């Protein structure tokens, strides 16, 4: 059988299932692939439950995570869908951003209603910037009483509102993943309804190329007779020859310069785009004026900061993390983009210590400024060894 070519004609959106253990996240993922396979067999292979449940391990920012990737298409879109087998895997995935989500399907069992992990996942979604949620009220075939279904729906809406999601407007679709997976036509139709809601309520993400230019500096060279070249991978946006850029971070002051050349694989280009590994020739900049860890950006789009709040996951001993807890005034290195900066940790009110395997909020003060914005991810390291991962939730100073 010939391999299907990936069609770039449809918009691509990344989504995932979140919610409490045993509420049916993986069953729902399998059922979506089945129902879409039945509706559009030429577009969609069916991915069985056990294939998703045996999720392969991946590494993101030094942390091992089990994560299953499934793809499927609706009439309108191409989706990449992530599902994690274990609760800890969800937390690690959401904090490290191993698999970015443009939106999530929150799975809540109609027989249980929202449970502790439901709340934890919604809180994490809020903190790590999963912008949109659609609710699948699963196991609805097990509840005969309409009033109970309405109560559970109300509870879920209130929970979402309490974490600043638009609880009143979020689509809540009653489904039975198991029945749909077993081939029940009516419940299959409910899953198509769920996917129509996902199509309509999770907007297309802004592509990296449309965002303002940013490139983390990995290396600095001098080219005799031409000047200083910085190299790195363009994270977002486009940089053109003769454009003005700023060099931000590490040093107290921001420097402005002009890009006089863009090179890739020793060829001169007119521009560098998101995803390209390029060298940028900078006008009037000395080798010692720039260093790894700074970023080159479109002027006035990002600022340097030293104090921030973050949500972090601390590796346990088996994951190669610490063997002992840490306390306030812990001073590890924070690895942002391409470099380590030492920082001092303040723990939230009432938290005495953080154990390996915990996830927590914290405030950090860095000894050098970093070009920073909410949503920026980092690793926590001790002597080059990753002991945690996190994401900036609020810039303070």
Curated annotation (Swiss-Prot):
Monomer. It holds the Pfam family GTP_EFTU_D3. This is Elongation factor Tu. GTP hydrolase that promotes the GTP-dependent binding of aminoacyl-tRNA to the A-site of ribosomes during protein biosynthesis. PROSITE patterns: G_TR_1, G_TR_2. HAMAP family: EF_Tu_B. The keyword Signal does not apply. GO terms for molecular function: GTP binding; GTPase activity; translation elongation factor activity. Its EC number is 3.6.5.3. Mg(2+) binds at residue 26. Residues 19-26 are annotated as: G1. It is found in: Cytoplasm. It comes from the Bacteria. It catalyses: GTP + H2O = GDP + phosphate + H(+).
